[in-house]
């Protein structure tokens, strides 16, 4: 039976859970991730499965469901809580889920103060069956401390504690229960535990927790569910909470063995008696539920440490000791990373086994809890353990030896591979795509997407948003926002409308979304408090709960409110809020009902309007309905009807009217306006109105009706109603047509309109249309001949991309404007982003008035104003110019013949100091020179110009092998500047042809009569051939000249063919001579010359001598030895000589050079000079060899000798020459370097020259630094020490950046060739000219809060004098004021100011929110910078202002509220979030009132919590309005009764922004109050001198046959007492009631009857009545006398009823004992007779009789030594005591007297004893109300004297001793004597406590009368609840 009861209780509790609301359990913890401000939140929650429609087909592990929002505590951030299901309990209809989220808070700089954020997950509702917190909101919170000062090792950062429990813990009712809160701390901190005092949490009474151990103790006294929340805090102040349910059940158990009923079944400790011991929990009633098995189950409270990427397993095992039972394990909060690998359930020993392979994303602590249940319903204790997934040192990587991490690709080793490198994102740290004009969402929690800066779009933010006004552009939606909590979306839209009427209207697809669960549904019921028929009111009170139930069928979480109105002519009113939204319909008091009124003002429409306007507690995003219950139709003016309609539309409230009477006007109105429903109820006296109201509510929810708000210009075209169903989860599309209206004027910029889907929500639309842009003027300030780059500016309120168009351009004499190098023309258009270049005309500068040009900006549709750009060109010293000589090169006619020429230069400044500065003249100086007058000009020298010209001469001093032109560079210098470029001229070195040199051997000797072959020769160094001419032939006679080949005669002149020159010599050997027989010298001769084609040689004459006939031997030439010499040297003397055997020829030989050397020259010396050697010379012919310049290598020449006879050595000799190379040092000259401050860095090169052709590699060294200039290597490294080698011989000359003036400087360098031969040290001249640089203006952003000012500096710099740069205003802000801080005056265009002297103040209320997309900049202005010289301006800089919205919330509720006198006024204050804000906070500033204001928070049927006088209360009601209740002082009224001042505010980055101060005035409407009856006192006739005041029960207790005088008073708050009348509402049905008349007998005046109930006031101003009961009658609740008052207006008081109890006087019972003394032997029965009792006023009711055998001390005698028995036991209800000789019997007195007529007593031992007789009449003759305290009793005794017999023992078979008969007889006689004596004693006086002692009354309490012994039973037998009259 007990088990069946237990199962039944469990079944009932499960049923309650299943039908209840949804929250079961929750806890949340956190840990830092990667940095101090990136926090990962992990949470576990449990909810009812059946609450979520998506689980209608089943709930499975891994499913995802949204359960609410998590508020992260930093003002704005809320995220969806999407639970992933981790476990499911289908039996108890709950599931657990896991949710995690990582959030980055604002970073705090190192050393900054830590910030604590409170993170909250809260919503409604808890289960409705809770014994505490029923239907309350849950509130799961934790505190997060963002502390930058925790070091760099994230693993040491503080983490919150972690906890977890099963959602429902089952405890035993009426037993001591203990369980452990499962919690751990990842940092190892000591934890403290406490009961949470969270908002909305009331802890169960008697529940406590050990603060250090976390052990909860609780002894529930009631069955059912409790909720509790435990706070767990670490040593650093971080806390978490765990919130769960406790199920208190009666669980059968067994009493402890130490109890008197040990082993018996019990349901609680109270069922176990006289216990001397307990179980371990302190219980005497113990049960034996299943238990967990440790191991394998981890020890309760233990911590398991798991490593990442390593598989672990754990098991949970539970068992029951009874073999017939099975157990089922229910785990909770199993991590998603854990997989169930084995399930062995429903066994005597059940086991679950899990495997877990944690990944990095699973790092954290998980608390797992479980319980198990056997198949008989017994539930185990909870077991819990934690799993800590520890962070490895290196997350996505491995440890480095010696420290550090080797990360996988994309992970950051500086963050131990837990965070991505910059430029990577996601779980795998993939590379982000390029983000050109935006910021990538990087990091391990990022998604890699590129968030574009304003004005850019595209995946990579590389596409410029070119929103250009297009006359053909269609209407389009620019932006929209969706609210998750709204039924209507978008709830905001921004659109662009083309003003062209031909454009098709824009369709905005508004979506009405019906979710699976209607969770935001609010209904205000408005009731007529003074209907024409009182049944209307009564039926509303009676059946309002039915309406609530019907509404809950639509939405389980419906919020209902109650309002009242009255249409009575007297004291009627339009609206009073009785119960705010969410507080339900219960608790309506009859005092709210006024007397029925048949006359109606028909003000129900005004009442409904007032109710819609009233701040009744509506919340944002809900479906809103007002249900009006009325018994009359409405009557109203057209204006009142219009206000009614507009109010409902603007508030988006659906009206429903239920009428108990006519509703024709309502029906017509609702049909005309298109929304609302009215129905009539057919039965005013039943609950038909509930079904009618429900039907009407469903009607208005069956269609979506759209109405416009604030659309006075007609932008919107709305569709007809859309049929919908709120029972189906579905989206409905409602098309809204938007078009620019035609024919309308004064349309504001960016107007806004709204539309209401009535009842479901409102959408606001901001409309943009195109406006003309604005062009901004500009000023160009540059220097002469200096180009200026600039952009033109414009702005457009529509955010369109602009183009600019040149309306005029500068005159050509001023300059040109170019774009990309192309000169623009008037009318050209360009993008506003285009950069232009203004090129001043050459040397032009502004002399007086600035030049100008104009432009307009265009947005694609409209031109702007025409803006002007002024041009100012400042004069600057210009470099001179030079002129190159054009045409042919300057050449001479001959060597050393000067050629004159002139060079020109000019300077616009007409400088007189112009000079020609020559470049490198080295190439010229080798062959000639340039002279200025007689001065030779050298490299770097200068020549003064005169009148722009310099006269010069060029002379060629050396011949050159070939003609050669050489270019000479030069510049013109004006004393400070060189010409900007070099000029040049050319000189030509001419080769002058050398004539050939004719030679031959002369004289020649020939024998007589013989022939001689004659060779003629010519040498020529610059010709290829010559022609010989025999100019003259002289013969002596007999001789002849002939050609040797054909012997033809030669005659002069004879010319040969061209003869080739070889080795510099051409020879012709075809002339023969024939001599005669004569002997003569100079006998013949020939003269010849050679011609090279241009020049002829001198004539050469050859003489011929004829000798006698003699033999002639040819000579032999001597060999000149081969030799070696150096390259630049002349050889030693060489001799051409020979030997001639002919004596005559000795000493007469001639040396002949047959072949000249190829690479050198043969020289002869004459004194100290040398010249080229002739071909023939007298032997010994002394010559020298000199190699050609720079030649080295081998060379040779050939030679021979010839004798006088013309014979030569037939074998010429050749000498080989080896010319050794001699290295030559290079030469270096450095060109001057002229540059300016604007010259780009140029790489220069040192170019040494070396005559050694083989030396082309040099290395150069800087040996002296410039004093002012900076010299750097080509790599850009500054050379600051010497010597410094130049690796590539290149260098860079720059100026010091701090030099702002001209200077001249120089440096020295030298170079080495490859043989380390060093050059000369050359000096490099440096000339620097500083050009004043325009200052630089930089655009900058300034951020400020709305409605505040910002002091700032414009960003401007000047290279030359940064401290004195100034700003010139070019345009002013459009939406604010620019003020000069130092003067307080407004800035002006074109005025100059210090750059740090600005203050910007935006116009009131203006911010980024007012820009498209709510993105700044919201305002800007332009400026240029001026330098200290004030002669040049910068580029345009723009200062943009980003104005953070700081719009406080606004209050749009009523300023005046009304309530009735003596009526509480509930009202709400709601606010609209300010533009750009996110919250609405409320602060009450002051309350001026005699009443009381309470801030309340209502939680459904659980009721409301109130806080009195909430001044300075700070409330956040962003999603819900905050409800207040105002209570006026009773019976007070009046206008301005209460004045409440408050502000609304929002928080922006922790800073509060307050609204204006709002005031709500409460007027208390006077209401005529009914009078009041005041009972004063009454006087009983039985106690005439004892005046008795009335107590709270208003009861008169009187005795029968007496009377009572009742005195009472009346009062009326509105009127004096004299105007009151009193009457008896209903005369009594028994007894008589009189008006008291002191002069009448017994005071009995006028009899009060049905037709005359009036009671006149007595002379003392009080009222008196007298009540006389019917004689002899009595009873509790005898009569009720209702007394009432009525005032002169007819208002009747609430009747005050006097209850009269009439009672008889209870008569005590008495006992009669005929024989009071008996004597007997032991073991012999004593027969007691003659005992009886009587209760005179008892007849049929029960009387209690107790018979006990006691000793002389009154102690009960054990039934083991004495027994007695009664007759007729079966007729009475008797209980025999289990240990003592005692009977307790109950019955009527007749039955009990029969029972004791004969009694038998048997005592086994001797002694004196008593038979105690106790009678209790149980007080049944007394009134029931005092019966338990008015028991009457009687007590008497029979004396028993028992003696042991003198034993003569006879042995019997049963071994018993038998008393002799004599002894037995003596005993019997003694008993009879005792009985008689007792009877006489009783007659004389009843016995008292003093007689018997306390022992006689040990079983009961003693009454005040010592005669009477009170029964121990205080209960009343319901069988005898009757008046004493019946007894």
Curated annotation (Swiss-Prot):
It is a single-pass type I membrane protein. Residues 425-462 form the EGF-like domain. Residues 522-709 form the VWFA domain. It is found in: Membrane. Glycans are attached at residues 309, 1122, 1516, 1717, 1723, 1855. The chain crosses the membrane at residues 1861-1881. Disulfide bonds join 435-450, 452-461. The keyword Transmembrane helix applies. SUPFAM superfamilies: Cadherin-like (SSF49313), vWA-like (SSF53300). InterPro entries: Cadherin-like_sf, EGF-like_dom, Furin_repeat, Ig-like_fold, Ig_SibA-E, Ig_SibA-E_2nd, Ig_SibA-E_3rd, MEGF/SIB. Keywords: Cell adhesion, Disulfide bond, EGF-like domain, Glycoprotein, Membrane, Signal, Transmembrane, Transmembrane helix. Residues 1-20 form the signal peptide. GO terms for molecular function: calcium ion binding. Implicated in cellular adhesion to substrate or phagocytic particles. Belongs to the SIB family. PANTHER family: MULTIPLE EPIDERMAL GROWTH FACTOR-LIKE DOMAINS PROTEIN (PTHR24035), PROTEIN DRAPER (PTHR24035:SF109). This is Integrin beta-like protein A. It comes from Dictyostelium discoideum.
